[in-house]
Every structure is written in C-alpha cells, then in structure tokens.
Regions:
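C-terminal structured domains
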Residues: 246-332
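Long, hydrophobic alpha/beta structural blocks
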Residues: 2-282
C-alpha cells in the first residue's frame, strides 16, 4: 500500500477547538508513511466495518468528483471534510482530543480514507543533566498520543474513487437528540449494509434460536452453519443466509420456514458482504458450555466425524459428550 497524500486536522473537544492544516503531511518520511499505511491496511480488514455506496450528488460526493477532475486541491478537500466532521462531532462527542488523518491511499485502486485517531495520555522518559554534572532520568507525560497501528482507530472510512464504494466503522453518537452514525449518516450521507461480524452473528443466532425452539441443542446445526460460512469465504466475498438455513434445516421443512421468517424479519433474504478472512476464522472452532459449567472448544469439522467427538442422549434424557482417540491431554 502506498500513501500518496495525507493531511492532519486536530479536533480538541475539551475546548471546542479545531485546527485545520494548510499543508500536507510529509508522507515521504518513511515513519509517517508506515504509520498511516499500517492503520489503513488493518482497518480494511476490520470485520466490524459496514459497506455502502457514496452518491456522487451528495455534498461530499460532489467534492470527490471535483477532486478527481483536478478542480479541487487535496488540502482543500481535507479541510472541507474536517470542517463538516467537527460541526457534527462537537455536538455528539465527549471531551477528548481526536486527530483526524485524511489520506489518499493506493492498492489496486485509489481510496480517500478518513482515520479518526482518539488521542490518549502516555508517558515517556527524558534525560536531564543536573547542575553538578550528574545525570537524572524522569518520566514525562504526553497528553495527546495517537494510537499505535496495533490499536484500533476510533472510526474509519474508505471511499473507492473508482466506484465510490465505502467501508466504514464508527461508534454511534447523539446529534440533536437522535442517536446516529455521525460519519455515515451526517457527513457522508450514505446508507450501509450491516458489518460482517453482525451478519455472521445474526445467522448463528437465528440457527440457534430455531434449533432450540424445536428441541435441539443446536450444536450440529451451528457447526454446519459455521462450516458453510467458512467454506463459502474461500470463493466469495458475500454470504447467502437463505442458502445456509436451507442446507442446515434441509431435513426439516418446518424449521427451514421458521428460519427464513427470521431472516426476512432481519432483512437478510439476500447475499450480504462478508470479510473473507473473518468468515474463514468463524469456521475454525466451535465452543459449547454445559449447565454443569464444563466448556469444550473443538474444530468445527469434528462434528462430522464420530471418531473424535460425539454427543449422545442417555436413557434418562441427560446428555453425554464422548471425546475419542485422544493420546495426550495438556493443561492450558
């Protein structure tokens, strides 16, 4: 990934002060290049990101069109966006300092990215020379330290300059008494699909709910659903909830229809975007917990093979879990 341009706008909500830069950041500095690029690369993979499309007739969409044509300078685009962000956020944000980085990032295509970095307090060391010539070390407090690339940004949005598709994650805020997404709803003015995490979570919840309602523990059904989600991610960046419940409940039409009704109520009767890396991890392991407090985590594929694990019903209606072909047990 290459960061071509970047600008930094400072939002100090402790004093309702905003500072807009008149110059771009020096992205030729390798440390700055790496810092921004690493944050963007990580944010691209966030399973909590929602997707949508920016309309080119929206206020910011029009500015991006001008920018693509060369009629609007990057630093002016950044300042305009910063002013819009601050106008909405100052009414919906706690007393914190947020440094906003706006950049042009290039991978296989070009993106305009918005990184909201919430500053935090941190300490570093400093070396002093005393009057008598001896050396002293001190802890020095810094009040506005940005998150490291290993830490999550407060909010992030990327707009593909080719098709104006958007990936975005952010916390909700309250504006004029209404709880909403400030960046998506107010600044960019776009509708979004739910995140990969929410999509997978809802599919699992529906499968579990329908299974439990029809006197099943849901283990087989859930592991089947998770396995399908993971295998689908090997070839597609969307997941079809309808196909999943049809396969999971193929032996029981009543359960299948109940699951489809739940999907319809959740507006999930269509293929939905999913982060392939996240979806693949979903299908790796399944965890169960008994009412006696025992927890077991096992590879999803093992539920299809009775040589490793099997859940049986005793004559008195209780369950037993058999773990097989074990050569060694390790404490964790």
């Amino acid at each position: 990934m290459q960061i071509n341009k970047a600008a930094l706008e400072i939002f100090d909500f402790t004093s309702s002060l905003a500072v807009y830069s008149e110059h771009e950041l020096k992205v030729g500095d390798q440390a700055i290049q790496d810092y921004i690029a690493n944050h963007v690369a990580k944010a691209f993979k966030d399973p909590g990101a929602r997707t949508g499309t920016l309309h080119d007739a929206s206020p910011f969409g029009k500015q991006l069109v001008e920018y693509k044509k060369g009629d609007l300078k990057f630093i002016d685009l950044s300042k305009n966006l910063g002013e819009s962000l601050f106008t909405y956020m100052k009414q919906a944000t706690d007393s914190v300092v947020i440094d906003t980085i706006i950049c042009e990032a290039v991978t296989d295509t070009t993106y305009i990215c918005i990184l909201l970095c919430q500053a935090h307090d941190a300490f570093t060391h400093q070396l002093f020379s005393e009057d008598d010539g001896t050396l002293a070390t001190e802890l020095v407090s810094h009040k506005a330290v940005l998150p490291m690339p290993s830490q999550k940004l407060r909010a992030f949005a990327s707009i593909n300059l080719h098709d104006f598709s958007v990936r975005i994650f952010e916390p909700k805020g309250e504006f004029d008494g209404e709880v909403s997404y400030i960046l998506a709803d107010k600044v960019l003015q776009l509708g979004t699909n739910q995140s990969s995490r929410d999509t997978v979570k809802k599919v699992k919840a529906i499968v579990d709910k329908v299974s439990q309602a029809h006197e099943s523990d849901g283990v087989v059904e859930l592991t089947t659903a998770k396995s399908m989600i993971a295998k689908n991610a090997e070839v597609s960046d969307t997941v079809d909830p309808v196909r999943i419940v049809e396969e999971v409940f193929k032996a029981n039409p009543i359960q299948q229809e109940a699951a489809k009704k739940e999907l319809a109520d959740a507006d999930m009767m269509r293929p939905l975007p999913v982060n392939r890396e996240f979806a693949t991890k979903v299908g790796e392991h399944h965890k169960i917990k008994t009412d006696t407090g025992i927890e077991i985590s096992f590879p999803v594929e093992y539920m299809k093979n009775r040589e490793f694990i099997e859940i049986k019903t005793n004559d008195d209606g209780t369950l037993r879990i058999e773990l097989k072909n074990i050569n060694k047990i390790m404490n964790k």
